[in-house]
Amino acid sequence: MRVDGRGKAELRHIHIHTNYLKHPEGSVLIEVGDTKVICSATIEERVPPFMRGEGKGWVTAEYSMIPRATEQRTIRESSKGKVTGRTMEIQRLIGRALRAVVDLEALGERTVWIDCDVIQADGGTRTASITGAYVAMVLAFEKLLQAEKVSKIPVKDYLAATSVGVVEEQGVVLDLNYAEDSKADVDMNVIMTGKGQFVEVQGTGEEATFSRAELNELLDAAEQGIFQLVEKQKEALGDIVSHIE
């Protein structure tokens, strides 16, 4: 039995609150257990200079964490005057993952700004951000469709992410919380599409190694978890799903 009573292959409770904010074109509050992230999507009617004239859009992301999202207060990065390497890595990961499933040509010369703000952290903040950001982005695209600025919702597939790991005395477990993540022998983040294609796999042994058999078991667990997350995304999107499938 895991520390929170879940089975080894069981996700934490997932809830996606849509249209959580008033102003953005798309927004959600995603709850993955005690991890909570506000994700918003903003449409800008222009692209970065390096993309001008190509007839394609762009998706980029920013990620941050409020000071008391964690057990001990952390200083705001804006107070330090620079973004940490961890934050930069996560921002790039989110943007890169979303671009993998966006039809950039169908989007046209527009930029989608994704903002992910962690308001409570209990492990898996980057994977929750990706799963929530996808829904916020599709909500924003639906606004473009309603305004007849695009001919279809410009996504090629669903996108979700989760964590898996090898935890002492438990073996392979799905969707690690902070207590599990902090003592995991192997920690892995997996991003996949709704059709089961891999977008990114980040796996690391923490003073440990893992076998090919364990790698396969980790990926199998992640795949099943991601398919469940995609179903949660579909529930949150409601009728919009008909424009994707």
From Swiss-Prot:
Mind listing the GO biological process terms from this record?
A: rRNA catabolic process; rRNA processing; tRNA processing
For molecular function, the Gene Ontology terms on record are: 3'-5'-RNA exonuclease activity; tRNA binding; tRNA nucleotidyltransferase activity
Xref: SUPFAM superfamilies: Ribonuclease PH domain 2-like (SSF55666), Ribosomal protein S5 domain 2-like (SSF54211)
**A matching Pfam family:** RNase_PH_C
Its Enzyme Commission number(s) read 2.7.7.56
> Per the record, what are the reactions this protein catalyses?
tRNA(n+1) + phosphate = tRNA(n) + a ribonucleoside 5'-diphosphate
User: Where along the chain is phosphate bound?
Assistant: R86, G124, T125, R126
Q: Does the keyword Transport apply?
A: no
Q: What class of enzyme is it?
A: transferase
What UniProt keywords apply to this chain's record, in alphabetical order?
Answer: Nucleotidyltransferase, RNA-binding, rRNA processing, Transferase, tRNA processing, tRNA-binding
The record, for HAMAP family, names:
RNase_PH
Provide the assembly information.
Homohexameric ring arranged as a trimer of dimers.
Question: Could you tell me what this protein does?
Answer: Phosphorolytic 3'-5' exoribonuclease that plays an important role in tRNA 3'-end maturation. Removes nucleotide residues following the 3'-CCA terminus of tRNAs; can also add nucleotides to the ends of RNA molecules by using nucleoside diphosphates as substrates, but this may not be physiologically important. Probably plays a role in initiation of 16S rRNA degradation (leading to ribosome degradation) during starvation.
Task: Give the family, as the similarity comment puts it.
Answer: Belongs to the RNase PH family.
What name does the UniProt record give this protein? Ribonuclease PH
Q: Please give the organism.
A: Bacillus mycoides (strain KBAB4) (Bacillus weihenstephanensis)
